[in-house]
From Swiss-Prot:
<feature type="binding site">
    <location>
        <position position="81"/>
    </location>
    <ligand>
        <name>ATP</name>
    </ligand>
</feature>
<feature type="binding site">
    <location>
        <position position="142"/>
    </location>
    <ligand>
        <name>ATP</name>
    </ligand>
</feature>
<dbReference type="GO" id="GO:0006400">
    <property type="term" value="P:tRNA modification"/>
</dbReference>
<keyword id="KW-0819">tRNA processing</keyword>
<dbReference type="GO" id="GO:0005524">
    <property type="term" value="F:ATP binding"/>
</dbReference>
<keyword id="KW-0963">Cytoplasm</keyword>
<keyword id="KW-0436">Ligase</keyword>
<keyword id="KW-0547">Nucleotide-binding</keyword>
<dbReference type="GO" id="GO:0005737">
    <property type="term" value="C:cytoplasm"/>
</dbReference>
<dbReference type="Pfam" id="PF05636">
    <property type="entry name" value="HIGH_NTase1"/>
</dbReference>
<protein>
    <recommendedName>
        <fullName>tRNA(Met) cytidine acetate ligase</fullName>
        <ecNumber>6.3.4.-</ecNumber>
    </recommendedName>
</protein>
<dbReference type="GO" id="GO:0016879">
    <property type="term" value="F:ligase activity, forming carbon-nitrogen bonds"/>
</dbReference>
<keyword id="KW-0694">RNA-binding</keyword>
<dbReference type="GO" id="GO:0000049">
    <property type="term" value="F:tRNA binding"/>
</dbReference>
<comment type="similarity">
    <text>Belongs to the TmcAL family.</text>
</comment>
<keyword id="KW-0067">ATP-binding</keyword>
<feature type="binding site">
    <location>
        <position position="167"/>
    </location>
    <ligand>
        <name>ATP</name>
    </ligand>
</feature>
Length: 393
């Protein structure tokens, strides 16, 4: 956050955040409301939600939804973390893909026919066309997403400029701590679910207020969220579904439904299920997203109605600082998308999916807490934070 402010010299910081389920195909560690508090206490002025229909997607669709929201809010610069750290290299890679489209597509097809995933095939294709020093390593997840952010900016004819901050020490998927002060999100999540680890283990790697809110969530709700918490629901659902039922689920490719139904039979945990399910063709993240759609019963028809090829249909405001509130007041007439401060009365196919995913997310809670949280999510107004006094209002 400090680097973003230094790099962009921004007046305000706006964060677009996924809701209950994430782009890598798993439940968020804690609710979006607690994550909003974390963002506000760490310098963000406006926190808005990226709907499930965009958030649990491949990088291209995820980026398209996020950029459309930021564009509507009048953002002048986007800043993202990447393994590369040079925005120019992203533009070079996009230019090569466009100028060498025929060669690029041929190479991607060639590498996929060799049994590689699309992400791996794309990475190899770029390396065959562009020298490594001018090319973005497309095997890295943050680089993949960063490239799609810039492509979305160009596609939407936005005047937004792109900046990127190089990730140091830990890569996105690193599972262990290699540095005294920097840790990957994956390693932090792993430590939080380690029975032999306490919350103090991760304190050197996250802001003090973030650690406090994390502990507060555990005390109030008795759990953190990961796939294992939902596995019994997931397995039960699959045991009651046929291959024909699964074919209606979004992102279910022909043949994958048979493999899923076969591997679930003898799986005693989500991890063991994924280990049995994965192949060279399907990445772990790609399979997790398919599993998320099974868990939430998100169908191809529902996503079609949500019309994800277009921009996000609304802006769900989750939280704001005093500065953020002032920005919205001054610019609300320029913002073409409806801004939702709650979802109780608004109707849209995208929001129908959102309501369902929230219900599933809270399903692991005990009653009456489960019902209370679900009701609150629809009526919850944006969290307000005074950045001067550092207090929630």
């Amino acid at each position: 956050m400090q680097q973003t402010k230094k790099l962009t010299q921004s007046d305000i910081i706006i964060a677009v955040m996924s809701g209950p389920f994430l782009q890598r195909g798993e439940p968020a560690l804690i609710s979006k409301w607690y994550r909003t508090k974390m963002a506000l206490t760490n310098g963000v002025d406006l926190v808005v939600e990226l709907p499930y229909a965009f958030a649990t997607q491949k990088a291209e669709t995820f980026a398209n939804g996020a950029i459309s929201i930021l564009n509507a809010l009048g953002v002048s610069e986007i800043c993202f973390g990447s393994e590369d750290g040079q925005a120019e290299n992203f533009y070079n890679t996009i230019a090569i893909q466009k100028n060498e489209e025929e060669t690029f597509n041929r190479l991607v097809k060639q590498f996929m026919n060799a049994g590689n995933s699309y992400a791996k095939a794309t990475s190899e294709a770029f390396l065959h066309i562009l020298p490594p020093e001018k090319n973005v390593d497309m095997s890295q997840p943050n680089n993949i997403l960063g490239l799609q952010y810039i492509k979305a900016i160009l596609l939407q004819n936005s005047s937004m400029q792109a900046q990127t901050i190089k990730r140091f020490a830990s890569h996105y998927h690193d599972e262990t701590f290699h540095d005294q002060h920097i840790a990957s999100a994956t390693s932090i999540r792993k430590q939080l679910f380690n029975e032999n680890s306490s919350s103090t283990t991760i304190e050197p790697f996250i802001p003090k207020m973030t650690a406090s809110l994390l502990e507060n969530y555990k005390q109030n709700y008795g759990t953190l969220h990961n796939w294992e918490k939902y596995f019994s629901f997931f397995k039960y659902k699959l045991m009651t579904m046929s291959s024909e039922d699964l074919q209606h689920i979004y992102e279910m490719e022909e043949g994958l439904e048979h493999r899923i139904l076969s591997k679930i039979q003898n799986s005693s945990s989500f991890y063991s299920f994924m280990e049995a399910l994965k192949t060279k063709r399907y990445t772990w993240t790609r399979l997790q997203r398919a599993c998320t759609h099974i868990l939430t019963n998100t169908t191809k028809e529902e996503i079609h109605k949500a019309n994800i090829e277009q921009h996000a249909p609304y802006i769900r405001l989750l939280g704001m600082s005093q500065k953020g509130q002032t920005y919205l007041s001054r610019n609300k007439k320029k913002i073409e998308l409806p801004i939702l401060t709650h979802t109780k009365t608004f109707e849209h196919p995208t929001l129908d999916i959102e309501r369902k995913s929230n219900a599933v997310y809270f399903s692991i809670m005990q009653e009456p807490l489960r019902t209370q949280l679900l009701k609150q999510d629809a009526t919850h107004h944006p969290i307000r934070y005074d950045e001067i006094t550092k207090k929630f209002l």
